[in-house]
């Protein structure tokens, strides 16, 4: 599945469907990425060692590029769809909330890299699907690499 990112503004999310699953694609602000290490102690799996993601997303950002987050938008607890709460200090989630996602079914909370907070019913981070970029503004979900023209 190809997604045009050229109109996705910083701080926005789109949710296309891939293999009947919602894909959360977020254009992260630099401040969103900068805050990620600040709450590692509050996460169940901050290094994503027990979570599902391609090797290239096994980093603090859980992404190929800092500015684009790609997740399967299904809670790893019981399969509900987490809602976006990107604003730090959101009144619903409290002053210490760094921004991220909250599952409306049982309250699991995930940061802006899809990592699950301690105290959440979900046991693992949100899944990162395979994906690659074709140029700066085209995201291809479902593949780990894109063949270049003339490659054998």
Where are these regions (language model features)?
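Short strand-connecting beta-turns/loops that link adjacent beta-strands
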Residues: 8-10, 30, 136
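Rieske [2Fe-2S] iron-sulfur-binding domain
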Residues: 41-152
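Short acidic, gly/pro-rich beta-turn/loop elements at beta-sheet edges
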Residues: 13, 26, 35, 113, ...
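Short Gly/aromatic-enriched secondary-structure transition segments
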Residues: 29-45
